[in-house]
């Protein structure tokens, strides 16, 4: 059994790997590392977007099958129990002979959840909740969509100290500085859609793109 600090270090590495995946799209960003019985990282993987292999399968593909038997998979999200464009990760871990699975956040999806129970039924030791707060913060956008069945919405509002959004004569182009504009475009790049009101569309004809700050 691995010590707590070994598992936490592995989970933070898995979270770092998850950040390599695309921020937009319906699938969550997930990372996975596989530990040897000695606690060494012997394989890593992450999800690269809808239709590609999930993090657990990506990690297993980089590992000699003999080394997978009895190893520990540390993954940021509970392995899925769903067949879509790819097969269920829980089954892939079972077939590979993984001995233990440690995950951070339970999968709330109505179709993809239940992977932990499937793993336990196959005799695999399963533990959830490791660094759950850190991973949940990283997955906040996706978790809202998965739990509530609606998009995660970010409202952008810029105003001056006296509560104004533009000059009264309409001559102002921006009231924010370069740092704020850069932040907005970084957020746009991570979003699936950009919306504005009718007034803004008519007055500014905005391009609604993600680009470098002007």
Segments from the language model and where they lie:
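Active-site ligand-binding patch in enzyme domains
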Residues: 66, 144-145, 150-157, 161-214
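Residue-level signal for inorganic ion chemistry
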Residues: 14, 31, 80, 119, ...
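Structural motif corresponding to alpha-helix initiation and N-cap regions
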Residues: 86-87, 132, 136-140, 177-181
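Short, basic/aromatic recognition patches
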Residues: 6-25, 142-145
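Proteins enriched for Cys/Gly/acidic motifs involved in redox and nucleic-acid/cofactor modification
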Residues: 23-24, 52, 116, 130-160, ...
């Amino acid at each position: 059994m691995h010590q707590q600090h070994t598992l936490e270090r592995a989970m933070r590495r898995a979270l770092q790997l998850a950040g390599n995946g695309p921020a937009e799209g319906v699938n969550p960003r997930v990372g996975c590392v596989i530990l040897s019985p000695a606690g060494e990282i012997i394989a890593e993987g992450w999800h690269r977007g809808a239709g590609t292999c999930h993090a657990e399968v990506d990690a297993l593909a980089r590992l000699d099958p003999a080394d997978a038997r009895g190893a520990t998979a540390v993954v940021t999200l509970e392995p899925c129990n769903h067949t879509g464009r790819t097969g269920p990760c829980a089954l892939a871990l079972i077939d590979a002979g993984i001995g233990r699975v440690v995950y951070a956040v339970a999968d709330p999806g109505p179709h993809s959840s239940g992977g932990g129970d499937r793993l336990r039924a196959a005799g695999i030791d399963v533990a959830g909740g490791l660094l759950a707060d850190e991973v949940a913060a990283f997955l906040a956008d996706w978790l809202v969509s998965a739990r509530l069945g609606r998009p995660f919405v970010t409202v952008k509002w810029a105003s001056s100290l006296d509560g104004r959004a533009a000059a009264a004569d309409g001559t102002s182009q921006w009231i924010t500085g370069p740092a704020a504009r850069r932040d907005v475009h970084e957020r746009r790049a991570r979003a699936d859609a950009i919306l504005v009101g009718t007034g803004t569309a008519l007055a500014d004809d905005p391009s609604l793109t993600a680009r470098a700050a002007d």
